A protein has these predicted regions:
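General marker for long, soluble alpha-helical cores
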Residues: 1-126
Length: 126
């Protein structure tokens, strides 16, 4: 396959450590995507939820963080949401809010943020 130097280096490091690279050893993934898949694998998460090259690295990160927190990522693991929108939905789930009130891809993330706070969400940044 055709991998750039950075991706090839990451894949070689993982192979050297005896780790499985089959999930992301695909030229369709860029460095940021490989990093998020690798982090998910290291954290023991089911990366099959986001190991799709159609998700960008930021979207993958938000899905990974939700999985790590035990959240229902199906509420936002959808390409129609950008990573900032996913973040607001993830934080709403973390605050146990009814995210259906602001899970609309037509809303910009700032609008989602304000709605989340109105519903009692924290100003949480993680």
């Amino acid at each position: 396959p055709n991998f750039d130097d950075v991706k090839m280096k990451k894949i070689r490091e993982r192979l050297k450590d005896g780790l499985d690279v089959s999930t992301y050893a695909d030229p369709k993934f860029n460095y940021r995507q490989i990093k998020e898949i690798q982090l998910g694998l290291d954290e023991g998460l089911d990366v099959s939820v986001y190991d799709d090259p159609k998700f960008d690295g930021g979207q993958m990160k938000e899905i990974r963080l939700g999985l790590k927190d035990g959240l229902d990522v199906s509420k936002y693991a959808d390409r129609k949401f950008d990573c900032m929108q996913m973040r607001e939905i993830r934080l709403g789930l973390k605050d146990e809010l009814d995210v259906s009130e602001f899970s609309d891809s037509e809303l910009d993330y700032k609008e989602m943020y304000h709605l989340r706070l109105e519903l009692g969400g924290s100003k949480n940044i993680k």
